[in-house]
Amino acid sequence: MNAALEKLSQTINGTVQLDPLSKALYATDASVYRKIPLGVAFPKDLNDLQRIIQFCNDHSVGLIPRTAGTSLAGQCVGDGLVVDVSKHFTEIISLDLEKKQVTVQPGVIRDELNDYLAPHGLFFGPNTSTANRCMIGGMVGNNSSGTTSIKYGVTREKIVSMKAVLWDGSTAEFKDLSSDAFKDKMLEASAEGQIYKGIYNLLSPLEIQSQITDAFPKKEIHRRNTGYAIDLLLEADILGGDAPFNMAHLLSGSEGTLALTTEITLQLDDLPPSYAAMVVTHYNSLEDCLKDVAPVMKCNLYTCEMMDKIILDCTKSNREQSENRKFVEGDPAAVLMLEVRAFSEEALQKNLLQLQNEIKTS
């Protein structure tokens, strides 16, 4: 296999690393899992991606897309060929200020994107704890959320469209499709056409739709990455719903198992209000903490995060984090961290008062 991979390296503009050190570095992500890959490919362009896919098809090799590798559950770990797009697919392609949309390649870092957007009064809302190094492609693959998901939603909800390379090396753009446009796609003899035909045949039977509706987590639960989001596809008008069909919603959260993404268009939000405050409520039991969540969520929060005693105790003996826990009073069983924001100091104080009153009466 090494000889074949070396030959592949000679046919692409990028590189394929086969040395033991490179394999060891890419054998894990930010998780505890470890598998030595066959090699690591660094494609430079679309043609490289297509050649890599053709190689994997010809040699029955698994393909593992990867960006920053900050995932915590082994999403980009495997014994196939790792395809790292973080090195060359790093361009912010375009910004549409009127539509408040930006198009990027998957290797763009989340915080660097927001640095670019800030002068325009815009930002990309989902904010993982690794926002200064995680990349948009990985956020799409994982359907990342972050602390402000209660206000700005998850990554899937921000995706307007995606361009991708499919299993046969052909390209496709996934975006909102009307019922008529969906039917036209089904008539195509391409790989993309096969996808739409397959989706329709799989999901159109009412019995299947009923099983999906009954078995999948409630849509009201924002952070619910439990496999392919086929339940969301049922909202499309072609399948009996009232929304356009968008395959990008299925790609988000699929962890790179369905296609290689080359471009992502995102819907942006206005920058959040600049006046902010954090209220930290302390509890003697985890149950009391959880009971307060529903009442305080009525107060237009930007963040609502819980830390229990296990996490709090871990920070006591950590040299770095012990400096960050000075707000903790006593030895609580749990705390809630509640962020409020406003466009003025006066409005902020009003929001704080509302939150404090809600806490007192809950």
Specify the residue positions occupied by each region the protein language model found:
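N-terminal flexible segment immediately upstream of the FAD-binding catalytic core
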Residues: M1-Q54, D58, A68-K100, S129, ...
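Generic non-transmembrane alpha-helical segments
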Residues: A3-T15, R51, F55-H59, Y116, ...
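N-terminal glycine-rich flavin-associated loop
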Residues: L8, L25, S31-L63, L81, ...
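Glycine-rich, histidine-containing beta strand-loop boundary motifs that form or position
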Residues: P20, P65-G69, C76, P106, ...
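C-terminal substrate-binding/cap subdomain adjacent to the FAD-binding core in PCMH-type
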Residues: S31, G141, S149-Y152, I159-S362
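Gly/Ser/Thr-rich beta-alpha loop segments that engage phosphate groups in nucleotides
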Residues: G69-C76, I109, I136-N143, T148, ...
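Short, acidic, Ser/Thr-enriched surface-loop or helix-capping motifs
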Residues: S71, L97, M135, L166-W167, ...
